[in-house]
Amino acid sequence: FEHIKIGRQDFFDKQIEEWEFEVKKWKEEGENGKKPKKPRPLSRPDVPNGDHEERKWNIPENWIWTQIGELCFVTKLAGFEYTDYVTYVEDGDLPVLKAENAQRNGFKITDFSKVHSESVKMLTRSQIFGGELLIVFVGNVGNVAMVPYNQRYFLGPNVGMARPYFKLDSKYLELFLQSGVGRSLLMSAAKATSQPSLSMGTIRQAPVAFPSLEEQRQIVQEIESRLSVCDKVEGSITESLEKA
């Protein structure tokens, strides 16, 4: 818990430093445009509800139960931000991520819409650098995908984003939330209507079974190793059927 607390504080301190730099730059340039907004203190998620508690299980002694909102900054592109600043252009240099990029089995590359990075640079919350999680909150609700590294993106409409506050294995979080038990925890607070949906608050509220960074990496390695074997078996079966 102390590690999480320190990580959250470091994240906020960095936000303040970046804001102070932007304010200084804004003043040096003659205070043109709006003054950069001061970051708000990091919010705490609502405590898990009864359904969450019922779905928890006994975890190893050195693990903890925490929540997405304790581990990650969770946000979405606001409606007014999309209306006022986002214009798709063919010659854009920044691909836009949407709900279609988060499938049940992870990130899917599509024919991305694009924007000019310069036109959306003020929307700092929606800048994506890799390692964040996409979480679909309408439509294919509950789909989770880790954004690949080494490519910048922009967060588009109808999909939430969870950015870790500190160093953790994002792949572990992705696999946990894609699992039957993890998805159940995420979806237990979804609005039960004909078309279920999640709010940013209910995403933050979802519990996560959280081990040490070393164990996260070991778990990811073990799962990916087994999935690799499954892929090979599936490929072999497909090849045999095609030859039959």
Where are these regions (language model features)?
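Short, ligand-facing micro-motifs at secondary-structure edges
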Residues: E81-T83, Q103-K114, L133-G156, S170-L175, ...
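Short, well-ordered loop/turn sites that connect or cap secondary structure elements
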Residues: Q127-F129
